[in-house]
Amino acid sequence: MSSDKTESHTAPLRVAIAGLGVVGGEVARQLTHRADAMKAPTVRGVEIVAVSARSRDTDRGFDISNIDWYEDAAALATRDDVDVIVEMIGGHDGVALELVKTSLSRGIHVVTANKALLAHNGTELARLAEESGAALMFEAAIAGGIPAVKTLREGLVGNEMTRLAGILNGTCNYILTTME
């Protein structure tokens, strides 16, 4: 992360969310409504400092009046007070790609559920993350949201994995369950 950011583990994690549709809006609602639960002495709090979406006037079920609003989602990555960017815009290019690349290049951690972005640009984004020391988190983009990446990365680190097979997609799982 950039040198002017507070590295304290007691200061709240400052989050900017790009895209307030179904998923991004629910992330923001959960972070907003569960803010008190996340202020426990053993848990670092979370503060939404900025958001961007197509329309400012949409009722999203949470108050955005005290959150900085950006018309241009890519501009979120230029803020010096953001620790994590949550990208929920969608698409593999354009503003989503610009936002994620700029964020990672600046050492800002990125969370995304954007399958297209990762499929088209995953190698480049992973390289940018590694070079800057930023985390590129994409657990929600694969395996129907189950913690498959974390399990493989952390839980099976001592095992020699040569292959993984299965249908790890929420849509396919739903269709197969319905067919039973």
What feature does the model see in each segment?
Residues S2-R106:
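N-terminal glycine-/serine-/threonine-rich beta1-alpha1-beta2 phosphate-ribose binding loop
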Residues V22, A143, P147, N159, ...:
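Charged, alpha-helix-enriched surfaces in structured cytosolic catalytic cores
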Residues A28-R29, G61-I64, G122-L125, P147-E154, ...:
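Short acidic, glycine/serine/threonine-rich loops at helix termini
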Residues S52-D57, I142-G144, I167-N173:
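Glycine-rich beta-alpha junction loops
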Residues Y70-E71, V86-E87, V111-A113, L136-A140, ...:
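General beta-strand structural signal in soluble alpha/beta enzymes
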Residues G91-R106, A113-E154:
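Rossmann-fold NAD(P)-binding glycine/threonine-rich loop
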Residues R106-H109, G170:
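Glycine-enriched alpha-helix->loop->beta-strand junction motifs that scaffold or abut catalytic
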Residues E154-E180:
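Conserved anion/nucleotide-ligand pocket segment
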